[in-house]
């Protein structure tokens, strides 16, 4: 179990919370997280690259010039890979890059990644509840009050972020906002700093703590 200090919007202590999720063994955690990140990145690839082979490239079957007497190397087709505009040998074709990983492993990897970041995470009570209009400066000021530089990669996890909060964060290039039920291993490990809404922490326990 990991205990967390809850901060208010001004960056002052407002209570405590705790979270306890099942994680992978230390001996296998690194391998599990590595496979989970590889899988996520592989699934983001489009796999639409395609080239034409010598049978698909445009052109006739006519011999470009006679076999003998030209002093040049013999050629049987203008579609040969040896000629400019000819077919491609072993070129890419549309394919899926998906990597298999069973559900238990995926959830275990996610919980392991999350619990590894919780000790350094900032838990904020009523995140942005007092914002009446979108103000990026308010988000920057909050990050500064809790000791986070807005120039580093920051992941903000909220339960149900409002449109005001989304628009307030939108202009911050290195700040990413995701919902508590949409967590993924790559974002958790890629961020330099983690900010979690207190209500989002409850959702995380509910969604990911049942295994």
UniProtKB/Swiss-Prot annotation:
Biased composition (Polar residues): 41-54
TM regions (residue ranges): none
Keywords per UniProt: Ribonucleoprotein, Ribosomal protein, RNA-binding, rRNA-binding
GO BP term (any one): translation
InterPro entries associated with the record: Ribosomal_uL4, Ribosomal_uL4-like, Ribosomal_uL4_dom_sf
Record region (Disordered): 40-85
A single GO cellular-component term on record: ribosome
Stretches with biased composition (Basic residues): 60-71
Molecular-function GO terms, alphabetical: rRNA binding; structural constituent of ribosome
Keyword Cytoplasm found: no
PANTHER family: 50S RIBOSOMAL PROTEIN L4, LARGE RIBOSOMAL SUBUNIT PROTEIN UL4C
UniProt subunit comment: Part of the 50S ribosomal subunit.
Family: Belongs to the universal ribosomal protein uL4 family.
Described purpose of this protein according to its UniProt entry: One of the primary rRNA binding proteins, this protein initially binds near the 5'-end of the 23S rRNA. It is important during the early stages of 50S assembly. It makes multiple contacts with different domains of the 23S rRNA in the assembled 50S subunit and ribosome.
HAMAP family to which the protein is assigned, alphabetical: Ribosomal_uL4_B
Name used for this protein in its record: Large ribosomal subunit protein uL4
Provenance organism: Prochlorococcus marinus (strain NATL2A)
Annotated gene: rplD
């Amino acid at each position: 179990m990991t205990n967390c200090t809850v901060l208010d919007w001004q960056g002052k202590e407002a209570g405590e919370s705790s979270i306890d999720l099942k994680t992978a063994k230390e001996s296998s955690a690194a391998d599990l997280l590595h496979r989970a990140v590889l899988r996520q990145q592989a699934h983001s690839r489009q796999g639409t690259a395609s080239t034409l082979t010598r049978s698909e490239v445009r052109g006739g079957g006519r011999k470009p010039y006679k076999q003998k007497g030209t002093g040049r190397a013999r050629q049987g087709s203008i579609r040969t890979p040896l000629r400019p505009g000819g077919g491609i040998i072993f070129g890419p074709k549309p394919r899926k890059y998906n990597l298999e990983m069973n559900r238990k492993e995926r959830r275990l990897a996610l919980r392991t990644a999350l619990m590894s970041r919780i000790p350094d995470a900032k838990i904020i009570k009523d995140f942005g509840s007092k914002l009446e209009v979108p103000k990026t400066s308010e988000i920057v000021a909050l990050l500064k009050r809790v000791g986070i530089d807005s120039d580093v990669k920051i992941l903000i996890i909220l339960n149900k972020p409002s449109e005001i909060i989304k628009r307030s964060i939108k202009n911050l290039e290195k700040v990413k906002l995701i919902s508590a039920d949409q967590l993924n291993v790559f974002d958790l490990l890629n961020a330099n700093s983690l900010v979690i809404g207190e209500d989002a922490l409850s959702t995380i326990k509910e969604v990911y703590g049942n295994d």
